[in-house]
């Protein structure tokens, strides 16, 4: 397992090669096996390939265009270019998995304290599911990219998905072999208390 963790990379270039339904099913099943707070399993995974992927990418493009004019995310303008680049990656990848929080509070309202705690727990649970999926993709010889730039089209994508979008995952055969990214030094990341 440690070797898979060490070898996982964020892939931003994909080959024009199909990914089998069996491979995607295995990745999705790994996500479903993730631990979750109070075993709530807040996730719903929506796989988009082919025409559905093209349609949802068009939805994201419309959301990014709207964000430029009428921002949903305050002060988002400096990051729009990154979201547009991510959209091109999504168009290139053969499969996109969208992760929806089935028990989320709406992004449009201020959460109560209970809802805020629940959202923190749900975010941790969904993060564990996504990590399981990225590691399984790596183990299967596939590349993946954990995508959060979908928030620039949060309203549009959540409507298309019929649920509160949390993140997305691009999946495909890597057309690049990036080096490991720098990590914090152990002494800056780990504190021992005994």
Task: Please give the residue ranges for each predicted region.
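C-terminal helix-cap and adjacent tail motif
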Residues: 3-11, 165-194
